[in-house]
UniProtKB/Swiss-Prot annotation:
It comes from the Eukaryota. This is Riboflavin-binding protein. Plasma and yolk RBPS have the same carbohydrate components, whereas egg-white RBP has a different, ovomucoid-type carbohydrate chain. Required for the transport of riboflavin to the developing oocyte. It comes from Gallus gallus (Chicken). The modification Pyrrolidone carboxylic acid is found at residue 18. GO terms for molecular function: riboflavin binding; riboflavin transmembrane transporter activity; signaling receptor activity. Disulfide bonds join 22-49, 41-90, 50-94, 74-155, 81-127, 116-186, 120-169, 133-151, 184-219. Glycans are attached at residues 53, 164. The keyword Membrane does not apply. Residues 1-17 form the signal peptide. The lineage of its organism: Eukaryota, Metazoa, Chordata, Craniata, Vertebrata. The modification Phosphoserine is found at residues 204-205, 208-210, 212-214. GO terms for cellular component: external side of plasma membrane.
Length: 238
């Protein structure tokens, strides 16, 4: 049954990618394709907008630098904080669905990707004791001639920079993410996203504020079924 769910996700992924392609960033492909040898971001290996060699930068902890951006300007991130930061990086660089939320003003960027409240709260909890100097990681850096990032402000704890998980999710990457009012029609950067994506795509022609209660109910029902299948699969492997 879990294999059926994965197959369904592959079908959804294929149809989505034909419609949206990939973002137009410096590491993105023109269109998603399989990358079976990914070192990280394996959630997207069956249909990826990044090449496998890009993920080498994310494969070893602690992560120092990704492309021309250093992650350790205020000291190394804790492993738990690094893991969440990596999930966001993987989504932006590799997800075949990211272009569903492309920013029309800048086609290498995303806008208003719906994240689950629980994901944002867990991310904040993981990073609250780490330090940061840029409120917006996209704009609040001093960039040198090579494009590398340097702090313009002093390093402070995440818990001082951001009030809570909602503030962090809706500030750290500028307008890239928003916290969803739904607990199902939102992304968690894990396999459960295969359920949410199907229903988010069906709402793609609607205004984001007009959330369909029927879609919410259908999503919740399928999410419960998916979780049960995952639990069943885990028990079979024991």
């Amino acid at each position: 049954m879990l294999r059926f769910a994965i197959t369904l996700f592959a079908v959804i992924t294929s149809s989505t990618c034909q419609q949206y392609g990939c973002l137009e960033g410096d590491t993105h492909k023109a269109n998603p394709s399989p990358e079976p040898n990914m070192h990280e971001c394996t959630l997207y290996s069956e249909s990826s907008c990044c090449y496998a060699n890009f993920t080498e930068q994310l494969a070893h902890s602690p992560i120092i630098k990704v492309s021309n951006s250093y992650w350790n300007r205020c000291g190394q991130l804790s492993k738990s904080c690094e893991d969440f930061t990596k999930k966001i990086e993987c989504f932006y660089r590799c997800s075949p669905h990211a272009a569903r939320w492309i920013d029309p003003r800048y086609t290498a960027a995303i806008q208003s990707v719906p994240l689950c409240q629980s994901f944002c709260d867990d991310w904040y909890e993981a990073c609250k004791d780490d330090s940061i100097c840029a409120h917006n990681w996209l704009t609040d850096w001093e960039r040198d001639e090579s494009g590398e990032n340097h702090c313009k402000s002093k390093c402070v704890p995440y818990s001082e920079m951001y009030a809570n998980g909602t503030d962090m999710c809706q500030s750290m990457w500028g307008e890239s993410f928003k916290v969803s009012e739904s607990s199902c029609l939102c992304l968690q950067m894990n396999k459960k996203d295969m359920v949410a994506i199907k229903h988010l795509l069906s709402e793609s022609s609607e205004e984001s504020s007009s959330m369909s209660s029927s879609e919410e109910h259908a999503c919740q029902k399928k999410l419960l079924k998916f979780e049960a299948l995952q639990q069943e699969e885990g028990e079979e492997r024991r």
